[in-house]
Amino acid sequence: MWKYCIHIVFVLVSCHVDAQVTRVVVDASGQGDYRTIQEAINSLPDDAPAPRVIFIRKGVYREKVFIEKNNLLLEGEDKDQTVLSFAIARDTWRCDHPDDWGVATLNLRGSDITLKNLSIVNSYGFDNTAGQVEIVCSADSVNHRKTIIRQGHQMALRSFQTTRLKVINCILKAYGGDTVSPWNVSAGMFYFKDCIMEGGVDFYCPRGWAYAEHCSFIADDGPACIWHDGSADSDSRTVLKDCSFSGYDGFKLGRYHRDAQFYLIHCSFAANMADQDIYLVPTTNIIRWGRRVYYYDCHRKGTDYSWYADNLVSARGAPDAAGINPHWVFRDKWDPEKEAQP
């Protein structure tokens, strides 16, 4: 009997230990478990049944970060004072590398990742204000040189096979294009809440299924703020709810090159936004499902433009705006708001 009781106690203690959340602390001054974010990531196993927490204390971490592991929460102490920053132009990177792995400040391949209370910055365009530079480029087979412009692609976040990504109360910024690039057109599910995003052309450009709520978008340059690729599945969509848009005089809202599906609900636009609807860029791509751009209760400071008048009734299934939420986007595949926090 005693042996049986001891065995039960041992099992319960083991379960409790297994259920405990792994937590490591990053502190650039050396007062934590690790000085760099990458060291903390590298210290953990590739996977785990529950999220591992990497708590990052205030500071500026000038490093490029790679995450190929699953089930991680990177949480900053303060979004304004916990800064991950690196300077890299995509065109420079691709001169010596065959793909985009490493092109961003934060590079993701793992899934079930949460980013919280962080600033993630690609500072290339902010640092290089001269306009353009010429570099040696082995990928250029003719001249072996390339001109890098300040407005070119500069990714703060770039994902690959990643799905079930949550970004909460973060600042993501670059001066150039494709600042926030969560790309997984066939299976990617991405959730953004209470974030600030800033950049150039297509600086928020998800592929797959994306939901952004109460986010602010700031355009520094370029012919569009938002972009979407939903070409792999007619159900994929990008939803922007209670979001605000501002930027340089005459900034344009959005565009697409492939099949896309936009829903803008209760969004607000600065007075200096251009009178230009989300538009299709002419290419050789075949658009199979037609134009799918929908608005509800969106307003510009001053006089409204007619093109964002309510048209949800024309969307498939004529959805009710009140029912457009994460569950409506991700269906039964994922509910980012109901999952237990570590």
Can you describe what each PLM-predicted range is?
Residues 1-21:
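Bacterial Sec-dependent N-terminal signal peptides
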Residues 21-342:
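Sequence-level preference for short, compositionally simple segments enriched
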